[in-house]
Regions:
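Basic, polyanion-binding surface patches
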Residues: 1-166
Length: 166
């Protein structure tokens, strides 16, 4: 018998994860949400994955045959954008400077970096769908900035470890 979902979440909160805003476009509809379940899959072809809960508006748009999406990797100073896309029912795109990438998906002009994707494949897994995206365009926007990280139920920064004996 598998462990309880509360135990599962308790363990995973100890794993630090980068914070992204995933935006999805289908037809004229767009939506976005904060996602930490993001990973690279393959360099050839360039593939990434995001995991999207079945219950949300984003999942509905991802399921359309014309869906495109972008993964916006947030900078350490972009907690407000992360929170807006995680919790707000207001116009999520009202904060931040947004533009349209090659596929038509919204990308954040001043993110750390972004990946613009078409849906390569879908895989149902429990309460979520794993979307594999084929990267059509990408950009490192602010290469000298630190990423936003989420660990142990809070946003964190990255601190370089310095060994004075080196």
């Amino acid at each position: 018998m598998p462990i309880q979902s509360e135990d599962f979440r308790d363990v995973l909160r100890h794993f630090p994860a980068g914070v992204t805003v995933v935006t999805v476009k289908s037809g004229e509809d767009t939506h976005g949400l904060t996602v930490s379940a993001f990973a690279s899959v393959s360099p050839k072809p360039p593939l990434i994955l995001v995991c999207i809960d079945h219950r949300g508006r984003a999942h509905e748009l991802f399921e359309h045959s014309d869906a495109v999406f972008a993964v916006n990797i947030l900078r350490a100073d972009q907690e407000d954008i992360s929170n807006r896309f995680a919790f707000s029912d207001e116009d999520r795109f009202a904060i931040g400077n947004w533009t349209t990438a090659k596929t038509g998906a919204p990308v954040l002009d001043d993110a750390l970096a972004w990946l613009d994707c078409t849906v390569y494949s879908r895989h149902t897994a429990g309460t979520h769908t794993i979307y594999i995206g084929e990267v059509q365009a990408s950009r490192v926007v602010t290469p000298d900035e630190a990423p936003l990280v989420y660990w142990n139920r809070a946003y964190r920064g990255i601190v370089d470890s310095v060994n004075e004996n080196d």
